[in-house]
């Protein structure tokens, strides 16, 4: 089983517990996945970078974040030589939440 580390702190395994956020890379918004402990700080860094670059900060929508997570977990399952039950469980939870329609 491959381990995917948080790109911010490099300490936590985010294989089955990732949190979507974004970074500003030369003026281009790029999605990244961080651990639970780094999420707020990473989102604050993105907000500050957006405001500094005069791009305007728009929070990541819940459904957009869930779609990013779904793609992340699907890629983990496709890359993984073994079938990790934690990743499969996380993917099932994300797909369940995506299936719920907005009221």
Model-derived segments and their meaning:
Residues 6-9, 33-38, 94:
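Hydrophobic beta-strand residues in large extracellular and virion-surface proteins
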Residues 46-103:
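Short, intrinsically disordered terminal segments enriched in charged and Pro/Gly residues
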Residues 32-54:
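Short metal-binding segments enriched for Cys and/or His
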Residues 1-2, 103:
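The identity of the second residue at the extreme N-terminus of proteins
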Residues 2-28:
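Short recognition patches in nucleic-acid-associated and regulatory proteins
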Residues 12-14, 41, 74, 97:
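Generic alpha-helical hydrophobic packing signal
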């Amino acid at each position: 089983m491959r381990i995917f580390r948080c790109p911010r702190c490099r300490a936590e395994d985010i294989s089955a517990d990732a949190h979507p956020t974004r970074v500003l890379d030369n003026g281009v918004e790029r999605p990244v996945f961080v651990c639970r402990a780094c999420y707020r700080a990473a989102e604050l860094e993105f907000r500050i970078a957006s405001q500094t670059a005069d791009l305007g900060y728009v929070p990541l929508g819940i459904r957009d974040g869930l779609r990013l997570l779904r793609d992340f977990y699907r890629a983990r399952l496709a890359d993984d030589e073994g079938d990790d039950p934690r990743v499969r469980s996380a993917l099932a939870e994300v797909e369940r939440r995506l299936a719920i329609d907005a009221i």
